């Protein structure tokens, strides 16, 4: 058995060879290759002339001595054109109803059926058995068929509540393709002199029959860790709650798990990882609406839960809140004391800020939280100039509650100890205090919790870095996950600097 990382490198090189001369079709080739290597089926949706048939032809070259069958369905197609003509000799001499299958679907490893929804019931029923059981009933005998990949294509989806839904449900991977978009790729496609039917794969990379059979057993040995199952179940529950979510059968979930196992196996891993779950975006949708919905839900799963991003942010919020509580407990020591000005006979007492308070924006902590303007408030941000004017001349004073939003009007006063006191609508008061000096640093309790959180973040980021080397996952998805982890890391580091 090849080393897992050597196998992953080989599959990557095999895919690169198959992709040569095909523009903006890398993802489709890679998923079709994954389907072929795990014995699954693919549905390609898109307008005519966008290389759907060429993708299927290319996949034949992934295997040594693979046979291919390609057919364009019409409403007049007959089973003989797909599964082979009847043997007149057998019928005449022995009275046996038997098909001559050489060169037809029952003896092909790679099958491409275009305009699949135009097939009649006789073809569809036989095709369902071929997909489900890899068997073909030929007269009185049941023969095993060698089909490794079925690629079905159409420029439309099957009608809802039609007899075609059973076949559509067997198409595990569903890809929506479009014309070449990039200008440079479009030019290269127009000027390419490459013969699209040439074999682009070196013999050393092609998969032998023995390797294919061995890999089918080894794919089944890839484990599904508990934390990955929990993510899958979370996705399933979330979809069940959404009124517009597509119906996903238990059969489709089970077949999707084998695809995830194959993704892990051909990426050199012994267990399914969260990154493999991104493949579900190409397995669970039914139509255009559900395609967008599925992608949104998987994006939330990947950027919020798969590497504990949301859990770490929740922990960080609790740590920050605890830090504020500790600061509030020290507020008596750090209560802002203003300086009294003028004589005792002045018509209005005037005050000023201490000379060591020089920041242009002051963040003052409440000794105890108050509900102000329908918000639980633990600190208030003031513009220094506005606070100085209020201390000197009185009038209206405004501040940002918890440092966010617009400045709100406040009921602020100076008590007999020359401390600033803010009051709520019930006149409950809370003394305002300066945050602890930065020189004092974080309390030991908070520092330890932040260090533990940062350590957990580093572990999750390292896990993602190891897992993201997956050929079958688009780079833009990996980029969004990396950004979500970096955002969590930045917030942790910011809290450590407070």
Curated annotation (Swiss-Prot):
Example of a GO cellular component annotation carried by this entry: cytoplasm
Subcellular location field: Cytoplasm
Keyword Chaperone on entry: yes
Glycoprotein recorded as keyword: no
Family matches, as InterPro entries: AAA+_ATPase (IPR003593), ATPase_RavA (IPR023671), ATPase_RavA_C (IPR022547), MoxR (IPR045427), P-loop_NTPase (IPR027417), RavA-like_AAA_lid (IPR041538), RavA_ATPases (IPR050513), RavA_LARA_dom (IPR046898)
UniProt GO molecular function: ATP binding; ATP hydrolysis activity
Residues annotated as binding ADP: 23, 49-54, 196
Top-level enzyme category: hydrolase
Disulfide bond entries: none
A UniProt-annotated Pfam family: AAA_lid_8
Activation/inhibition comment: ATPase activity is stimulated by ViaA.
Keywords: ATP-binding, Chaperone, Cytoplasm, Hydrolase, Nucleotide-binding
Primary location recorded for the protein, binned into one broad class: cytoplasm
Assembly mode: Homohexamer. Interacts with ViaA.
Role description: Component of the RavA-ViaA chaperone complex, which may act on the membrane to optimize the function of some of the respiratory chains. RavA functions as an ATPase.
HAMAP family the record matches: ATPase_RavA (MF_01625)
Family the entry assigns: Belongs to the RavA family.
Stated name of the protein: Regulatory ATPase RavA
Organism: Escherichia coli O157:H7
């Amino acid at each position: 058995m090849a080393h897992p990382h050597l196998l992953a490198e080989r599959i990557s090189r095999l895919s690169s060879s198959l992709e040569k001369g095909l523009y903006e079709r890398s993802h489709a080739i890679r998923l079709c290759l994954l389907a072929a290597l795990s014995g699954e089926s693919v549905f390609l949706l898109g307008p005519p002339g966008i290389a759907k048939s060429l993708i299927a032809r290319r996949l034949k070259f992934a295997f040594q001595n693979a046979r291919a069958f390609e057919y364009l369905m019409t409403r007049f197609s007959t089973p003989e054109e797909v599964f082979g003509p009847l043997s007149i000799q057998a019928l005449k001499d022995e009275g046996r109803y038997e098909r001559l299958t050489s060169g037809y679907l029952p003896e092909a490893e790679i099958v491409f059926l275009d305009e699949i929804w135009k097939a009649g019931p006789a073809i569809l029923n036989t095709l369902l058995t071929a997909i489900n059981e890899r068997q073909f009933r030929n007269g009185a005998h049941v023969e095993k068929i060698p089909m490794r990949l079925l690629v079905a294509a159409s420029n439309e989806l099957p009608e809802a509540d039609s007899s075609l839904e059973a076949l559509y449900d067997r198409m595990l991977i569903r890809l929506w393709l479009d014309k070449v978009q990039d200008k440079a790729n479009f030019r290269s496609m127009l000027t390419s002199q490459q013969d699209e039917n040439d074999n682009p794969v070196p013999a050393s990379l092609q998969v032998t029959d023995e390797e294919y059979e061995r890999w089918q057993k080894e794919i089944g040995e890839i484990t599904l860790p508990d934390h990955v199952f929990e993510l899958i179940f979370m996705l399933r529950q979330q979809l069940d709650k959404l009124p517009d979510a597509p119906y996903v059968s238990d059969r489709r979930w089970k077949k999707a798990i084998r695809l995830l196992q194959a993704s892990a196996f051909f990426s050199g891993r012994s267990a399914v990882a969260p990154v493999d779950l991104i493949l579900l975006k190409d397995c669970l949708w039914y139509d255009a609406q559900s395609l967008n919905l599925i992608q949104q839900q998987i994006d939330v799963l990947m950027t919020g839960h798969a590497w504990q991003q949301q859990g770490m942010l929740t922990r960080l919020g609790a740590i920050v809140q605890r830090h504020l509580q500790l600061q509030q407990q020290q507020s008596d020591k750090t209560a802002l004391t203003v300086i009294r000005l003028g004589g005792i006979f002045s018509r209005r007492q005037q005050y000023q800020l201490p000379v060591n308070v020089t920041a242009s924006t002051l963040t003052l902590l409440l000794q105890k939280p108050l509900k102000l303007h329908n918000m639980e408030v633990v600190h208030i941000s003031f513009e220094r100039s506005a606070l100085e004017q209020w201390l000197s001349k009185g009038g209206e004073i405004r501040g940002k509650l918890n440092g966010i939003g617009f400045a709100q009007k406040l009921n602020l006063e100076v008590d007999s100890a020359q401390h600033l006191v803010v009051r709520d609508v019930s006149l409950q008061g809370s003394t305002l205090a300066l945050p602890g000096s930065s020189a004092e640093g974080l309390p030991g309790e908070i520092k330890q919790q932040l260090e533990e959180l940062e350590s957990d973040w580093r572990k999750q980021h390292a896990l993602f870095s190891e897992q993201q080397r997956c050929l079958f996952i688009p780079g833009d998805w990996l980029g969004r996950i990396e950004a979500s982890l970096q955002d969590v890391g930045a917030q942790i580091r910011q809290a450590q600097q407070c």
